[in-house]
């Protein structure tokens, strides 16, 4: 006999609550509606989301797609009971990967999977996704909520995001004219962003701290809230600088793998990025992680962003103008180094000086 007292099993008896899913959809409709933009003004609930490239102003576009997740930063959100910002991280990780190719983010879809659906928790998560979409200027045109009993324990859940953007043909980055002597600018990160959290959690465990403990590196905040500071979204300032200065040659989103894995992805094989580590203003969270965990400088550089979330490559004569344009849009910009010649087989990122850890 089912839990409802009737003969025969129901989907609810198997752990899937369709009514909870419907309630979640109703809760998130205003947030989703708030992300509408030219090209996307439909309602959620259809079998697929629509986007009109002509209505968005494109004439001969190249589509650019990216997908990503939030990693084990989610575990902190789950354990701390703070779910309203990880959606911003989800969007940021995808749309920042689009803008580095010169593409304007247009649409976003999310995948939210959990063992037992909590409509309030889900609404908080999707509210963060919608906030990230508004900041990036892209429409949340659909998604999938999957309640899967037995697949996730306790209140665990996972998120994945999918973003599509576009650039007019011939305007994609990196440009083909990166040259020796070009200047490397760095845009400040908001914190750890969404990479390296397995190491972060290990360090916190070794320190014997709970997520509700005062953050040793952020006055007035709990450790959980401070570490959950959402990933910075660089889309609108970078798109404006790309269009107005026409001087950006390459961009690199500093994610997993840090400088040594991400910068070379946008460079020709004969050039390397020479970074003066002393020019980086290192946020206190990274100093705390390094000292508390005994993490060496090179390990920090290949695990975390260390205070720089985005790299910008420009010709030396345009560096000041590009920096000023980005600063006018609220970015904190530092001149980090320059492009140098690279021997075959040599690393694509080399360092001078030391980090201020």
Swiss-Prot record:
EC number: 6.3.3.1
Keywords for the protein's UniProt record, in alphabetical order: ATP-binding, Cytoplasm, Ligase, Nucleotide-binding, Purine biosynthesis
Assigned GO CC terms: cytosol
A family per Pfam: AIRS_C
Catalysed transformations (reactions): 2-formamido-N(1)-(5-O-phospho-beta-D-ribosyl)acetamidine + ATP = 5-amino-1-(5-phospho-beta-D-ribosyl)imidazole + ADP + phosphate + H(+)
Subcellular location(s) of the protein: Cytoplasm
Pathway(s) it belongs to: Purine metabolism; IMP biosynthesis via de novo pathway; 5-amino-1-(5-phospho-D-ribosyl)imidazole from N(2)-formyl-N(1)-(5-phospho-D-ribosyl)glycinamide: step 2/2
Biological process according to GO: 'de novo' IMP biosynthetic process; adenine biosynthetic process
Signal peptide (from-to): none
GO function terms (MF aspect): ATP binding; phosphoribosylamine-glycine ligase activity; phosphoribosylformylglycinamidine cyclo-ligase activity
Family listed: Belongs to the AIR synthase family.
Name by which UniProt lists this protein: Phosphoribosylformylglycinamidine cyclo-ligase
Species for this entry: Allorhizobium ampelinum (strain ATCC BAA-846 / DSM 112012 / S4) (Agrobacterium vitis (strain S4))
């Amino acid at each position: 006999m089912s839990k409802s007292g009737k003969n025969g099993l129901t989907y609810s008896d198997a752990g899937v609550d369709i009514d909870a899913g419907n309630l979640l959809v109703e809760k998130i409709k205003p947030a989703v509606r708030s992300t509408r933009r030219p090209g996307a003004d439909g309602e959620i609930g259809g079998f697929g989301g629509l986007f009109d490239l002509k209505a968005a102003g494109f004439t001969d576009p190249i589509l650019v797609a990216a997908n990503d997740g939030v990693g084990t930063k989610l575990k902190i959100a789950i354990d701390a009971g703070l779910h309203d910002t990880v959606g911003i991280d989800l969007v940021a990780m995808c749309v920042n990967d689009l803008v580095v190719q010169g593409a304007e983010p247009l649409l976003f879809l999310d995948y939210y999977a959990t063992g037992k659906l909590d409509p309030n928790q889900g609404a908080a998560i999707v509210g963060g996704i919608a906030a990230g979409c508004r900041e990036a200027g892209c429409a949340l045109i659909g998604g999938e909520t999957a309640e899967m009993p037995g697949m996730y324990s306790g209140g665990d859940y996972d998120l994945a995001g999918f973003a599509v953007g576009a650039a007019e043909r011939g305007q994609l980055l990196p440009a083909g004219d990166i040259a020796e002597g070009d200047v490397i600018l760095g845009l400040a990160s908001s914190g750890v962003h969404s990479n390296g959290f397995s190491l972060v959690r290990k360090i916190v465990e070794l320190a014997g701290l709970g997520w509700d403990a005062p953050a040793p590196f952020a006055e007035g905040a709990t450790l959980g809230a401070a570490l959950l500071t959402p990933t910075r979204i660089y889309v609108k300032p970078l798109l404006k600088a790309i269009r107005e200065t026409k001087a950006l040659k390459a961009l690199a989103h500093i994610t997993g793998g840090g400088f040594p894995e991400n910068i070379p992805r946008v460079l020709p094989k004969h050039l390397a990025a020479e970074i003066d580590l002393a020019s980086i203003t290192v946020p206190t969270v990274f100093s705390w992680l390094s000292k508390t965990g005994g993490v060496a400088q090179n390990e920090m550089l290949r695990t975390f962003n260390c205070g720089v979330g985005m790299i910008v490559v420009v010709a030396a004569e345009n560096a000041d103008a590009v920096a000023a344009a980005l600063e006018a849009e609220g970015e904190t910009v530092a001149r980090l180094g320059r492009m140098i010649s690279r021997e075959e087989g040599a690393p694509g990122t080399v360092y001078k000086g030391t980090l201020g850890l």
